[in-house]
Amino acid sequence: MSRIGKLPIKLPPGIKVSIEGNNVTLEGKKGKLFHRLPEFLKVHQQDGSLILENTADSRQSKAMYGLHRSLLNNAVMGVHEGFQKKLEINGIGFRAAVEGKKLVMNLGFSHPVVYEIPEGISVKVQDNTKLTIEGIDKCLVGAVAADIRGFYVPEPYKGKGIRYAGEVIRRKAGKTAQK
């Protein structure tokens, strides 16, 4: 049995849960999320918490037990508090701006890089170089942050590029002049 899967998921006040077979719908102050469980997992609500039960005994079901418990917990946290990732843009002339549902970035290329912001995600720009990505779906927030970072991964010589806030880039020494 999974140690993580056995743990109950505490429901904060104000979260509405509806369970229909293997479909779980969570609704909170930030929004609404839907999660579908595999056939071998059952969920029920008890004493202000959600409890998952594994009805199968296969190796795969044991692995999926902990995974789906974590995914449900992330959904509960998402509709209650939401998730955010912060990115920083380093480089001379590098900047970003939000125009409607598009993020426009000047990253030293001959053209601006335009990224279509997905539904359910909000991007805020401070000081033209600091991005904050917010949403209720943890997986989608992380994927959007990784997509944006992928446009110009920080390089080790000058440190130019898009990086996560607090990320440390290992710097390399450049070429030394030969005599």
From Swiss-Prot:
Which species is this UniProt entry from? Methylacidiphilum infernorum (isolate V4) (Methylokorus infernorum (strain V4))
* Subunit comment: Part of the 50S ribosomal subunit.
Alphabetically, which GO biological process terms does the record hold?
cytoplasmic translation
Q: Which GO terms describe its molecular function?
A: rRNA binding; structural constituent of ribosome
Q: Does the keyword Cell division apply?
A: no
Q: PROSITE patterns of this UniProt entry?
A: RIBOSOMAL_L6_1
Asked if the record carries the keyword RNA-binding, the reply is yes
Please state which protein family the record places this protein in.
Answer: Belongs to the universal ribosomal protein uL6 family.
- Protein name stated in the entry: Large ribosomal subunit protein uL6
Record keywords = Ribonucleoprotein, Ribosomal protein, RNA-binding, rRNA-binding
Q: Which GO terms describe its cellular component?
A: cytosolic large ribosomal subunit
Q: Name one Pfam family in it.
A: Ribosomal_L6
What this protein is reported to do is described as: This protein binds to the 23S rRNA, and is important in its secondary structure. It is located near the subunit interface in the base of the L7/L12 stalk, and near the tRNA binding site of the peptidyltransferase center.
Q: Which InterPro entries match?
A: Ribosomal_uL6-like, Ribosomal_uL6-like_a/b-dom_sf, Ribosomal_uL6_a/b-dom, Ribosomal_uL6_bac-type, Ribosomal_uL6_CS
Q: Which residues cross the membrane?
A: none
